Every structure is written in C-alpha cells, then in structure tokens.
C-alpha cells in the first residue's frame, strides 16, 4: 500500500495526572487541549518553552503548510502545527501504543487533516520516495525529533535530504541532545539554532 494512501487511522515538560503522561497544545484553535501519551522509553515530547519558541519562528510559515512529523510520538508537534493553521500533517509513528493514542487524539480533536501512519520513519521515507509522483504535494515543513539515545537523526536526515519529498525553501526542524554531534546534509542551511538545558534544536532550510 502506498505511504501516501494508507488509512489515516521546562523547559516546562509534560504534566502527569491520574497516572497518565500529558502535554497541552499551547496555541491556535486547540489551545489548552490536553493530549495523553504512553510511558515508552525514548518518548520525550517537545516541552512548552521549546514549542513556543519554534512556533514563534514559524508564525508566518505554518498557515496552509503541508507538514511531515517523522517521529510523531506524543503528537506535540504535528497537532500543534494543525492547531495553528497547517493544511495537513502526515504523522509517522512506530510504537503501537503511541500510534493508537495519536489516532484517538485525531478523533477527539476532529483533526481530519492529520494522516497517521504506523511504520518507522526510515521505512516510510524509503517507500514514499520510491512512489513519489510529479505533481504530488511537496512538504513545506518537516519535524525530526527522534529519541535522543538511538542515534536515528543523522540517518533519517540524510534520507530526507536526498528525497523528492520537498522543494527548495522547505523548512526542517531538528531536535537532539546538546551533547550529540550531527553531520548535517550539505543541502541544509541553518536558519535558527538554540539550546535549552540538555536539548539543542534548530530550524534549517533546503537549498
């Protein structure tokens, strides 16, 4: 089945209530809505302050944007983008538990423009690039925020940079541990870079 046609099925950190992990959407039409996420090793939602900084950077770019969230996890970035007016968000998640909650959030928020796909980022990128067709919508904005300890960022960044999935000028958000080195694809130029505690994050543009 095509990755483009699959069924859509603090630094202030996430709060905990009733034994569940929670975060909140901080801007847009769903501002204040809370999202549960499972306790899974490596699942670390982008905190409120970093998200606020990121979406301030993107204020002029989000409305109408076609977004890709490669390591969706809690859905913090994908649903935040939709809340603020993005046209669509394709959200990739490998964990079955996280995927099920993302689907539940989509239904609860009535987020019909969220496409949630249960696979790995690498598998999706390889298949999507192979099946990409001219005239298909490009991605304007890509979020890449994998589990820090698994060293997935560099491999998936290289796959994405060599893909057909976005256009010159597309923006890429990267998040990683501040102690991690990263060899960026030569096609990406830095726009904004910042650090908050043990998290380094930045916005890059496809040349």
What are the residue ranges of the model-derived segments?
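Class I S-adenosyl-L-methionine-dependent methyltransferase catalytic core
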Residues: 1-207
């Amino acid at each position: 089945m095509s990755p483009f046609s699959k069924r859509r099925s603090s630094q202030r950190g996430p709060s905990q209530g009733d034994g569940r992990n929670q975060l909140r959407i901080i801007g847009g039409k769903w501002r204040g809505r809370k999202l549960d996420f499972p306790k899974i090793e490596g699942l670390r939602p982008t905190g409120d302050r970093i998200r606020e900084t990121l979406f301030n950077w993107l204020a002029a770019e989000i409305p109408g944007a076609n977004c890709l969230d490669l390591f969706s996890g809690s859905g913090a970035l994908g649903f935040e983008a939709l809340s603020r007016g993005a046209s669509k968000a394709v959200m990739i998640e490998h964990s079955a538990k996280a995927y099920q909650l993302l689907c539940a959030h989509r239904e609860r928020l009535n987020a019909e423009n969220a496409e949630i796909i249960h696979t790995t980022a690498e598998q999706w990128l390889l298949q999507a690039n192979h099946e990409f067709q001219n005239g298909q919508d490009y991605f304007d904005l890509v979020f890449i925020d994998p589990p820090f300890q698994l060293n997935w960022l560099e491999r998936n960044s290289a796959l994405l940079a060599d893909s057909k999935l976005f256009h010159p000028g597309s923006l890429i958000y990267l998040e990683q541990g501040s102690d991690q080195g990263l060899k960026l694809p030569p096609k990406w130029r830095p726009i904004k870079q910042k650090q908050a505690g043990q998290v380094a994050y930045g916005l890059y543009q496809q040349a």
